[in-house]
């Protein structure tokens, strides 16, 4: 590029100068995050350091392969970043092998399937309606199209995992892989029981700990090891890192298969800037403050659930052992889709969610899913989450009394209280 063709602002102009339209959207999103309460259980707020790593010059570097075994030159420094992420992940989860290249939790699961399954093999995972995940064999997902997917659920009496059903289905269908974990499981999972069931039929055991990995790392939730053959996770959610995935194992033979399954199996060049963000987040998670944070995540979840129950709502399983809960709205006579939108107008962000044995359609639902990681990162404690619960009840009671079209005054009043609460706990003051 000659001086005549070199863009004079390419290396110096800010996004606001080069692309005001895009900058405006990002600025609006920053405002939303600052001014609204984030209760989506799968979301969190990363540190300025993680954002700096992810926005670094590592985004320029192609690095197909693994540290020390790349297909491109000039990888000596990205190797340092990836090795930091790997070593820190192994230390966090007390395991022997970690692949930090998956671009998402879904791709981490896909990598495991690629490594140990063939099309048509039987897998046994949790039913989506009971709290499982799309990648555990749901019909619309690739995992449900490529494999013979069988699903277990929860007991109707208490909405806890039906381990007797898991054993019966495993005995009947002889799966090659059993999956424990999901996207809406508020209680701890008995990994030893899953291991016993897997051993009884000669199956691999995969623990998908995408939602509770941060709790595991901090000792606030039982570890899947030594029971699991392999564990997968996202690196955001409770781990509070950039959006991405990871595969962990103690089995050296499986580790080689997982590495080959990710590259060259399902991915090409890894996202080195994201891996740098993972390394930064894992470094934060190794500090004592992270243990205190995760302890507060759980305490806040207990407080939120307790106050919602006091307000006349039901919590599936009666409470939570983790960061997440499912709120049953049926006692108030309203549905998840209506409540989700009303809370959004009040600047409380949630998602509608089916509950076990839900009589409503998936687009309607009888519940909403709530989580405490993002609010806890912001600095909210138990008293703030009790206040948030009361605000949720205020909106829901308003809907029940006034209907969706007549609830504007209630939502406006709650929106003002949300603004006051968020103002006490500001986000990203330097942005």
From Swiss-Prot:
Homology family: Belongs to the SHMT family.
Modified residues (N6-(pyridoxal phosphate)lysine): 237
Keyword flag Heme: no
InterPro entries the UniProt entry points to: PyrdxlP-dep_Trfase, PyrdxlP-dep_Trfase_major, PyrdxlP-dep_Trfase_small, Ser_HO-MeTrfase, Ser_HO-MeTrfase-like, Ser_HO-MeTrfase_PLP_BS, SHMT-like_dom
Protein name: Serine hydroxymethyltransferase
Cell compartment(s), UniProt: Cytoplasm
Complex formation: Homodimer.
